């Protein structure tokens, strides 16, 4: 049976995992960094191969956000190594990040990553873990749909901005249809604060106020928007 999924805001379960880069202690080995853990159904499968190539091509973007990548599947380390070699030889892409080898599904069980009807098969899950080891975001994709790496980067950047500013980001940030690249100010908690904020911020009403985000954060976030079809579909 699949394990209980760690909830947003909870600590990532402590465990030692085995990867093709050697053992890793989670979350301690990544303390001070953001971590994206993502599971895939199996090595040597077409959709998973496209995902790993996509993650590898954006690896430097993740590094700029102080973020490490960590893959996971129920394959063993030998399979991971051979798959990476195949990707390098056939597609000329180096996979620079480690992959957890979890042939018994023990790690996937702890993280709730097993497909409920697929036996020991990992789903396409994404966990974003902050520098303190807390789970901050969780994404799940069906087996027949590959992940969008641009959106994972945008989500990661938005989490970092909201932590820094104590604000929230609107839909489609940093290009929202209503407030553009601004961030949302949390609602007032007193009548006096509600009156004051109408003079302090740009507001549609006292409960809907917004302000500019730092320009450098906005520009970086825009790089992680889904790239136009003209660029992606060349």
From Swiss-Prot:
The lineage of its organism: Archaea, Thermoproteota, Thermoprotei, Desulfurococcales, Desulfurococcaceae. Belongs to the peroxiredoxin family. Prx6 subfamily. GO terms for molecular function: thioredoxin peroxidase activity. It catalyses: a hydroperoxide + [thioredoxin]-dithiol = an alcohol + [thioredoxin]-disulfide + H2O. One of its GO terms (biological process) is hydrogen peroxide catabolic process. PROSITE patterns: THIOREDOXIN_2 (PS51352). It is found in: Cytoplasm. The active site is a conserved redox-active cysteine residue, the peroxidatic cysteine (C(P)), which makes the nucleophilic attack on the peroxide substrate. The peroxide oxidizes the C(P)-SH to cysteine sulfenic acid (C(P)-SOH), which then reacts with another cysteine residue, the resolving cysteine (C(R)), to form a disulfide bridge. The disulfide is subsequently reduced by an appropriate electron donor to complete the catalytic cycle. NCBIfam families: PRK13189.1. Homodecamer. Pentamer of dimers that assemble into a ring structure. It comes from the Archaea. The active site is at 48 (cysteine sulfenic acid (-soh) intermediate). Its EC number is 1.11.1.24. One of its GO terms (cellular component) is cytosol. Thiol-specific peroxidase that catalyzes the reduction of hydrogen peroxide and organic hydroperoxides to water and alcohols, respectively. Plays a role in cell protection against oxidative stress by detoxifying peroxides. Disulfide bonds join 203-209. This is Peroxiredoxin. Residues 6-161 form the Thioredoxin domain. InterPro entries: AhpC/TSA (IPR000866), Peroxiredoxin (IPR050217), Peroxiredoxin_AhpC-typ (IPR024706), Peroxiredoxin_C (IPR019479), Peroxiredoxin_TDXH (IPR022915), PRX_1cys (IPR045020), Thioredoxin-like_sf (IPR036249), Thioredoxin_domain (IPR013766). Keywords: Antioxidant, Cytoplasm, Disulfide bond, Oxidoreductase, Peroxidase, Redox-active center. Substrate binds at residue 124.
């Amino acid at each position: 049976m699949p394990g209980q999924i760690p909830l947003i805001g909870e600590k990532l379960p402590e465990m030692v995992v085995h990867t093709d880069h050697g053992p890793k202690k989670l979350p301690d080995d990544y303390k001070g960094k953001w971590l994206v853990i993502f599971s895939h159904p199996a090595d040597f499968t077409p959709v998973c191969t496209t995902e790993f190539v996509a993650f590898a091509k954006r690896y430097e973007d993740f590094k700029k956000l102080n973020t490490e990548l960590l893959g996971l599947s129920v394959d063993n380390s030998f399979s991971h190594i051979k798959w990476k070699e195949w990707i390098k030889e056939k597609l000329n892409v180096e996979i620079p990040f480690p992959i957890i080898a979890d042939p018994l599904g023990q790690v996937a069980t702890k993280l709730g990553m097993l497909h409920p009807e697929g036996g020991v098969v990992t789903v396409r899950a994404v966990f974003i873990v902050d520098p303190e080891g807390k789970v901050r975001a969780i994404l799940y994709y069906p087996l027949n749909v590959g992940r969008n790496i641009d959106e994972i980067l945008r989500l990661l950047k938005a989490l970092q901005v909201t932590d820094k500013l104590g604000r929230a980001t609107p839909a489609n940030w940093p290009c929202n249809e209503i407030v553009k690249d601004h961030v949302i100010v949390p609602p007032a908690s007193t009548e006096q604060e509600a009156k004051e904020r109408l003079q302090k911020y740009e507001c549609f009403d006292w409960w809907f106020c917004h302000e500019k985000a730092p320009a450098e954060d906005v520009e970086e976030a825009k790089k992680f928007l889904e790239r136009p079809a003209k660029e992606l579909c060349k």
